[in-house]
């Protein structure tokens, strides 16, 4: 009886947190270019927490797998293993999207989190992510494609670098790759104050609206809330899309 009560408490807490997360979304994905007031300032965030998170995180990579279960109507659970998990749950923006990938052969690429990750009572080694799902069949490129990432600092294009894609990319994976490059080479995230005041990555598809992700989270940074920007499961056509990064210094 006590065990059942404890499980019920966990479920109520989990659903409440998801409700709050879905009604108070982090600033991030939007069309066109953000207004300055829409961007988070790095001095309001403990950037060393972001640095530690991105340095420790392992990029989830699983290919040709099928879902085995669901907790809620908009998520999918997979029996796949990583260094710290034996089950993986991805949350999508709605039930309709989850249905598109349910019981299908898919590839999963994304950034996992563990805090507030709940699958079921017995899932002690579990991980969660938002989005990160693409169809396995018919989505690979015959020839690997390089996407050029153009980086502007204080309004001046300062550098560019390539990301090689073997399939049409999931934007959560691309976003992680860009952040990692900028952290390693331009000190985007450090274990102290960031030298950048604001920053965002902009995706420019050929036949639909542009969208962007803020590099800095809101002051009340938590992994699960911040990574929710990826729940729309946006993908990018590697042959026709562009990527731009905009940074401002203090």
From Swiss-Prot:
A molecular function GO annotation = toxin activity
User: What keywords are assigned to this protein?
Assistant: Disulfide bond, Signal, Toxin, Virulence
In the UniProt record, the signal sequence range is 1-30
Q: Which cysteines are joined by disulfide bonds?
A: 117-128
Cellular component terms, GO, for this chain's entry? extracellular region
Q: Which SUPFAM superfamilies does the record cross-reference, listed alphabetically?
A: Bacterial enterotoxins, Superantigen toxins, C-terminal domain
Tagged with keyword Signal: yes
The entry sums up its family as follows:
Belongs to the staphylococcal/streptococcal toxin family.
What more the UniProt record tells us is: Binds to major histocompatibility complex class II beta chain.
Functional summary from the UniProt entry: Causative agent of the symptoms associated with scarlet fever, have been associated with streptococcal toxic shock-like disease and may play a role in the early events of rheumatic fever.
**Name recorded for this polypeptide:** Exotoxin type A
